[in-house]
Amino acid sequence: MEESNNNNFLFSPDYIWSQLLENNNNNYNNNYNNINNSINENLLNELNSFQNTGVFDLDTNIEQQQQQQPTEIQQQLQNYQEFQQKKYQERQEQYQIQYQQSYIEPLNFNETYNNETYCNIIPQPPQVEQQQEQEQEQEQQQKQQQQQYIEKQIQEIIKIPEKRQTLNQIPIEMMQHNFFNTPKLDQQLLSNYSDFFKTNPILPTTTTTTTTTAITIDQQQQNHIDNQSLNNSNTKTSKNQQKDNNLPKKKNLSYDITKITFNNNNIEKKRDQTESSKNFREKKKEYVKEIESKILALTLENDKLKKENDSLKTINGSNLMRPEPESINMIMECKKIIKKLEKALIDNDERSLIYLLYHYHSETSKRYSLVEIEVDKIANPYSQIKLKLAGYIQNPTTLDIFDGNFNNNNNNNGNKEEEEEISWFIKYKNEANLTIEQSNKLDLLRNQHGLIFETLLKERKQLDNEILKVFNEIIIASYDGSNANLISDKGFELKSKLKSLKMKIISSLNLNLDTFSSISSILLPKQEALLLVRAHLFGSSKLNPQMDFLNNVWTNIISSNSSCSVFEILNSLKEFSDLENLELNKNS
């Protein structure tokens, strides 16, 4: 038997694998035979039923087989349950043998039980109870022993209160128990200590002598210290007397110091005077500082005003209406982009056209932030005085794309400029190959822009005339010194007019920007680029000789050394109005 068991562990893996294959083949053959037998039986039953009835009942046979033959899973479950029940019965029998108690049936978990019922049902073993009782008895015995020991000590102390036990008389066990809670090393030290005192016993007289000797030594030390302190004090007093003798003797006073009296009222007055003088000096310093700070502020304001006056005197008409450097940079960038657009149109490069158009729109959007800065320069009272005295009324700025649309509605008097302004837009439509929808949308946009532009133009002309009247009234009132209230009232009126003018200018500029951005939604990128190129070329060819002439007149007036009055300025600008009248008569 031993040899066979040892050989089982020495099989090769090939042998094990071959045995596994044989087992699988045997199982497969058995299953196959069982299936064939069941199929043959089913076929025989179906043939018999067909001979009797003439119909195959396949479904009924299958259902009967399913009802008769339990499945493999159900069989496994039943076997498992039976096995578990057997195990449970064996455990209960073992439990009954160990604890000699009656057999308990298994609990029905469907029923509900409280904790008390479970405790009553489940029995406790007798061995555990015995152990608990023994532990309790041991604890009680230990407590009783400790109490007895403590009582004995208390009784001994009460019996002998007067006797003082020396170290020799005290037993070592008592010392260990009361004073020391130490290991073996401490016990050795105590034993050595007791042996030493046994060999050299201490008499009670020695203790008294040692105490007396210690007391005498302490007294001697204290006396020595007191003597030293007295000697030091005597030496100090003697030194002080010598110093007093060495000092020069003072002259004897002719009057007694005790008879001198002081007036308290005079002392209080002096104190009040000193305090008042201090307060006055502090206030004076603060006042001087305030005046100095005010003087510095006034000097700074005067210097600033002088610089502004000098700069305004040297400013020409062109410098007055010159835009900000940021807006100039924006215009120059737009011109560069338009040149690049023209080149891209010639090369027929659509990708570069889209990129340049995006860059152009981003540059023109900066105009919104620069509008208020430019408008503040125009709506400034100083610049408005110069413009009104010069007789120049600023027209609202229009886009070059929509310029000429308003003359189309009016009767054309054969002007070449108006014909050019109308013809270039028609040429652009043909060149860009616009559809009918695109051309209609552009025409509607131009008409809307024209209507809003005309309303703004009328409102601004009215405001310019009203501002000019207010300036004339202020100038006339300034010659009469008595009309100070009228000047202040007109000043408030002028402020309100300038604010409204500022709002109108901002709205006109925003109108141009909004209409320009809406063009990109109507046209294609190539068409928009072509429109920008054509409109830019047309707008750059226009000139404004009136503004140039006005700038020249204004520079001549300011360059003269003598201070010019209002009437002299008006006389010098008479030529400008005469030339305008001549041009109007020619056109009519």
UniProtKB/Swiss-Prot annotation:
Keywords: Coiled coil, DNA-binding, Nucleus, Transcription, Transcription regulation. Residues 263-326 form the bZIP domain. Residues 291-312 are annotated as: Leucine-zipper. Residues 269-289 are annotated as: Basic motif. Residues 127-157 form a coiled coil. One of its GO terms (molecular function) is DNA-binding transcription factor activity. The keyword Transferase does not apply. GO terms for biological process: regulation of gene expression. Its main location: nucleus. InterPro entries: bZIP (IPR004827), bZIP_sf (IPR046347). It holds the Pfam family bZIP_2. Residues 221-250 are annotated as: Disordered. Residues 221-240 have a biased composition (Low complexity). PANTHER family: CREB/ATF BZIP TRANSCRIPTION FACTOR (PTHR14312), GLYCOSYLTRANSFERASE-RELATED (PTHR14312:SF2). Probable transcriptional regulator. This is Probable basic-leucine zipper transcription factor M. It comes from Dictyostelium discoideum.
